[in-house]
Each structure stands twice: as structure tokens, then as C-alpha cells.
Amino acid sequence: MAVRAVRGAVQLERDEAGHMDEQVGALLTEILERNDLAADDLISIWFTATPDLHSDFPAAAARKLGIVDVPLICAQELDIEGAMPRVVRVLAHIESDRPRADIAHVAVGAAAALRKDIAQ
């Protein structure tokens, strides 16, 4: 097994805790499904949120999905003028037999515009 990294992003419609849980949970579920991963394959997950998100920690959504024994951390994204608002980004470190080129990075909705080179 190799250590790989999977990227993901989602733009929230509004800054509400329940909405964040729903959207980030859906993003994580899609990352796991597209890469044939189970929670045991996760090493750690970094979450970043744009400075306009204040309602909750994105990592709370992972805990609600049952990802309870994986190290998680949240940080604030750089406050860049003109950047897409209300975005949560994910960087998950995983164990996988897949070649790096076969890792499916997931950007949901408008967030797909952030990294057209890797979003699938």
C-alpha cells in the first residue's frame, strides 16, 4: 500500500452548521466512494474553510459520518481578494494500491472551477 493524497472542495450556499454538515458529508462520501475507500484507509484529513465561514468546524461532518479515529484538523484558507466565497477544501491522506494517476479528486458544483486540472 502506498500513501496517497486526495483533494476535494465544495462551495456552500450559506453559512449554516446543518448545511455545512450536509455538504461536507456528501463531499467526503463521494471521495470515499470514487476511490473505493473505507474509513480504515484514511490516515488523516485536513480541512480548510474560507474566512467567511463561521458556523461550524468542517471536521464535524466527518465525525458525524462515523470517521472517529482518524486525525482531523481545520484551518482557515487565505483571504485572497476575488477568491470564491464559502468554500470548504479537503486534503485526505490515504492508504491505497491505486496509482497516483488513478486517484479521483472531487470538486462539487461551482467548486469544480477551482481546480479544473484535477476535478473529476
Residue spans for each PLM region:
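Terminal domain-initiation and capping elements
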Residues: 1-120
